Amino acid sequence: MNTEGTLHAEGVPTIESTEYRSGFYREAGFYDAHSLPDYGAQSPVTREAFAYDFFPAAAGASTAETSATEPSSPAPLLVWVHGGAWRFGTNQALRDTILRTPTGEQPNTQALMRAAFQQAGWAVASINYRYSHQALFPGALHDVKEAVRFFRANEHEFGIDPQRIAVAGGSAGGHLSMLVAHTGDSAAGESVFGDSASAPEHDEYFEGRAASSYPSHSSQVAAAASFYGVSDLRTIFTDRPLAGYALDHPEDDGAEWRLLGSTYPVPADASTIDISKGERAVPGVCIERAQKNWERAHPIDAVRPQKRVNLKRVNKFKSALAQGASGGATPLMLVHGISDSCVPYQQSVRVYQALRTRQVPTVLVLVPDAEHGDSRCFSPEIVQQMLQFLNRTVSSE
């Protein structure tokens, strides 16, 4: 199998110790623009009908598989998963091409990406998922997979090709997109993570079919893209100092432990948590649940060469999903800013290296001087590269 790959730098770059840009987010009005919930005990929300924005392919557009003379041909679908530390953000992020912030107006490069995909013959769906204070992990993962099943089950209504669905997202959305790509319908066989869980328990943990309205449909996607996504929540704490940045998130919001149930390493006993040592736990969440989440919430574990798996597909895709040297792993494009002080770029480099070792089609684009969520990660050149990569990897031929 041919492996795609580009590094927009000489090898894997390193950066000098850099002043931590904790003010970057505050100056941009990041915290003013989002109302962050006050965390106490969780306020669970049962998954019902998720919210989505749907953008059909532009009339007369063409892709690598269809031409402008075939307007009725089903379109490939890009499912976009918003970011926001798993605790805020919205499916409306792709609507307006002008972004209005407390500091003024600027182009919404994510919406411009959506428009470029439409013009290239893709349909685009931007979805919501439950926040971490509404559903502990893997609730958000279940919601994204349910969205894939929903669109696949309603292929005729939306005019999409169910064999050509890709998923992509930024930051927290990139983390979820990578997990969707590399755990989809895999658990009916052996465990992706090599744990001792039974196949049914493992399957339900990653798929959430018990609460699904479309349990007979596959959650597998043909390809994926991650923009500055987290691939290993355990090492992000050490990656930041290695990259020359402070240990914690700006305005430390505890995004990781609030998502998974506790800090890492997981405290031995919820009743003896030592806050002075930085230990935290979400009220009402048992330590055993947090331990399981910390064992399974990392995309890197699903793609490492030593975790070679025979991923079983529910749908017999005629695309890049075929079994082969990759062990069935899903093609993935990664985009990351080298100056990202929130999620260091090493988080994407490791996934890229693991996929290359397994001969899985993959591309890594490292953006010089770009911060977390930087609009330069969605430049027209990168969007075109993303289109080319996804067109190749979701091809139905």
What are these regions (language model features)?
Residues 2-149, 153-397:
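Alpha/beta-hydrolase superfamily serine-hydrolase fold, recognizing
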